[in-house]
Amino acid sequence: MLQTTLLYLINPLAYIIPILLATAFLTLIERKILGYMQFRKGPNIVGPYGLLQPIADGLKLFIKEPIRPSASSRSYFLATPTVALALALLMWMPLPLPHSIINLNLGLLFILAISSLTVYTILGSGWASNSKYALMGALRAVAQTISYEVSLGLILLSMIIFAGGFTLHTFNLAQETIWLLIPGWPLAFMWYISTLAETNRAPFDLTEGESELVSGFNIEYAAGPFALFFLAEYTNILLMNTLSVILFMGTSYNPLMPQISSLSLMMKASMLTVLFLWIRASYPRFRYDQLMHLVWKNFLPLTLAIILWHMALPLATTSLPPLT
């Protein structure tokens, strides 16, 4: 009984701690890449080559006094960052890396459902802060997230038709001979751009546009609660890129050496994450109307047309006689 209880405790911790460590060092990689792209060094003082900078930042944030605005809603103000990080970590559970903690039959729908709940944490934090800048950022986030979830859901539906199942293990099996990136490259491009918008990253960072809304929905947050929001954002970035790899660049599972599958998945996800950072350094922010036009006038008709094509083609070819 004790052994089973310990196993249930250790398994999630062994899953969560590496994710949080990767998230911490992703912030360092981002600052380094942005630094080199702007012809400067980036963090290079704390530890060798600045490698201890994330630890210093974490300590600084968590030992500071959390300041709460006097007019804010205390319970909502403190609960939303915690819920944001919990939801971000919960979405990792069905991912095969190469084994998942919970093997769900509808793993993709679970991830989509949990990712849609994250918008409530942003809206709650903006409303609870009692600040017009925070509320404006939160309202932008709601409209942006709901809009891009439409395109994400339709792209996922098309990929499910491709792979033939809702489980993420099915995608690895379907891609043993060829990556789905090759026949489904228009979907892959739209998916990647939609993940940028879903994670509120540049050039779609309208929720926390520094030049417009000071800092967006988290302007009133400091110290620990701010760090939780920060961790949730970067955890979502890693999750979306890992999911992109599973959907479009699936890794074959080798039962003799499962670590090769994990290493391959990690390297591909790292490449996509670096591309996220490269895009941030290269492109200016979209205007709000351009952001909405992109999803409703471009992505939505395209994804609907591709779904119809993927559904119609197998039905049309089943009536053909055998070519013998």
From Swiss-Prot:
Membrane topology: Multi-pass membrane protein
Enzyme class of the recorded protein, top EC level: translocase
Alphabetical UniProt keywords: Electron transport, Membrane, Mitochondrion, Mitochondrion inner membrane, NAD, Respiratory chain, Translocase, Transmembrane, Transmembrane helix, Transport, Ubiquinone
Entry superkingdom: Eukaryota
Entry's localization field: Mitochondrion inner membrane
Entry-linked InterPro entries: NADH_UbQ_OxRdtase_su1/FPO, NADH_UbQ_OxRdtase_su1_CS
GO molecular function list: NADH dehydrogenase (ubiquinone) activity
EC number(s) stated in the UniProt entry for this protein: 7.1.1.2
Pfam family, one: NADHdh
Residue stretches spanning the membrane: 9-29, 43-63, 77-97, 106-126, 146-166, 177-197, 228-248, 259-279, 299-319
Catalytic reaction list: a ubiquinone + NADH + 5 H(+)(in) = a ubiquinol + NAD(+) + 4 H(+)(out)
Any one of the GO CC terms: mitochondrial inner membrane
Single Gene Ontology BP annotation: aerobic respiration
Family, similarity comment: Belongs to the complex I subunit 1 family.
Function (record text): Core subunit of the mitochondrial membrane respiratory chain NADH dehydrogenase (Complex I) that is believed to belong to the minimal assembly required for catalysis. Complex I functions in the transfer of electrons from NADH to the respiratory chain. The immediate electron acceptor for the enzyme is believed to be ubiquinone.
Name of the protein: NADH-ubiquinone oxidoreductase chain 1
Organism: Scyliorhinus canicula (Small-spotted catshark)
Gene (UniProt): MT-ND1
